[in-house]
């Protein structure tokens, strides 16, 4: 892809967001009832490629269990309210009632709420609650807190471990502390690790070489994030997913057959976004906003991420999304909305069938078109 000159001393690469691309239907169509949306990472197989984002407004132990029983994977935020407070419900209620007209005071109060220390015994209790339900157990920590709490996570019986930050590299350099050695950490861990976010080919390939089972693709693209405004950094998702999918293919050859899963994470607000992410090369999608619209979601129709309460530099906001139905209706319908906010698995099956594909791996070969002028 050729560079575009910004000025005499600087050029830039043209990249594309999900809104800039669309799928092209093919000559052959399929019956959507024959479409298989299953996804498997390591020894764990799921009916759908839906991963619940580790955000307090999206995933509680109860919603992680519910999502697991509906065929997806719920990832619990192990630095959230459920591991800081014995009973977080009053605080969740308070966050949803903070004044929308005064975002500064709302952010200040959220920072105060999240200042409570993480309690290892609550990490254990929450993960054991999920495990006792019989679903696959997954928890998430940031790179900064992984070293301190990972043993608690593993001992509590996590099946999958997620290391999730705004941007994670295999070669973080710091003069103030000893950074997490991802390759050594993953090698010594008996649990499969998904790690991210990443935004490009080189960064992703380096993470794949650490032994990660999956790589999360995305940087500051979520609907509740203000990273682009605050830091001036952005990675349009269509290009990011395609680049990381290319890294996966090259690493497959380099490693002699080791397949690392690509999980699109961020900016996937409606069913069409999920469909395009999977067609661009993602194996699965980590979603927040679509699940935050479920009646069971702990945010009660409000959506916020971990960046919203950062002590040093908040890069997120509470966003009112409203409730569109139960979690089952959000995933499988029936849908009473025409905007892609419910029956998202049904939408995926219909799109795959329309484009002539019966499984997700082959769907990654779907033809795409560029429609940068279209916003409908």
Predicted features and spans:
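Alpha/beta catalytic cores of nucleotide-metabolism and tRNA/nucleoside-modifying enzymes
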Residues: 1-27, 96-97, 114-128, 232-264, ...
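Active-site entrance/lid segments in N-terminal catalytic domains of soluble metabolic enzymes
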Residues: 1-255, 261, 291
């Amino acid at each position: 892809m050729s560079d575009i000159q910004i000025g005499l001393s600087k050029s830039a690469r043209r990249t594309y967001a999900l809104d800039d691309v669309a799928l092209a239907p093919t000559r052959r169509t399929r019956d959507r009832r024959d479409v298989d949306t299953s996804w498997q990472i390591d020894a764990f197989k799921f009916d759908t490629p839906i991963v619940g984002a580790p955000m307090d407004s999206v995933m509680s132990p109860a919603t992680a269990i519910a999502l697991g029983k509906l065929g997806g994977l719920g990832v619990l935020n192990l630095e959230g309210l459920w591991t800081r407070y014995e009973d977080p419900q009053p605080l969740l209620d308070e966050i949803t009632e903070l004044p929308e007209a005064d975002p500064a005071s709302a952010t200040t109060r959220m920072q105060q709420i999240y200042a409570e220390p993480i309690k290892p015994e609550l990490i254990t209790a929450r993960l054991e609650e999920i495990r006792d339900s019989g679903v696959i157990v997954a928890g998430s920590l940031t790179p900064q807190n992984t070293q301190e709490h990972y043993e608690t996570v593993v001992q509590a019986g996590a099946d999958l471990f997620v290391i999730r930050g705004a941007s994670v590299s295999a070669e973080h350099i710091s003069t103030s502390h000893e950074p997490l050695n991802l390759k050594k950490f993953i090698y010594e861990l008996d649990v499969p690790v998904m790690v991210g976010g990443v935004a490009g080919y080189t960064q992703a390939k380096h993470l794949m070489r650490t032994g990660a089972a999956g790589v999360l693709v995305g940087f500051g693209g979520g609907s509740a994030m203000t990273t682009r405004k605050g830091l001036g950094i952005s990675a349009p998702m269509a290009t990011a997913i395609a680049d990381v999918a290319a890294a996966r293919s090259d690493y497959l050859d380099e490693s002699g057959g080791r397949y690392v899963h690509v999980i699109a994470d961020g900016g996937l607000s409606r069913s069409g976004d999920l469909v395009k992410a999977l067609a661009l090369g993602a194996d699965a999608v980590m979603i927040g906003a679509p699940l935050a619209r479920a009646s069971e979601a702990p945010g009660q129709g409000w959506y916020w991420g971990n960046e919203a309460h950062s002590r040093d530099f908040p890069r997120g906001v509470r966003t009112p999304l409203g409730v569109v139905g139960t979690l089952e209706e959000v995933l499988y319908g029936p849908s009473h909305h025409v905007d892609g906010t419910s029956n998202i698995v049904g939408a995926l099956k219909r799109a795959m069938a329309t484009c002539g594909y019966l499984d997700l791996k082959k769907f990654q070969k779907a033809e795409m078109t560029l429609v940068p002028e279209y916003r409908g």
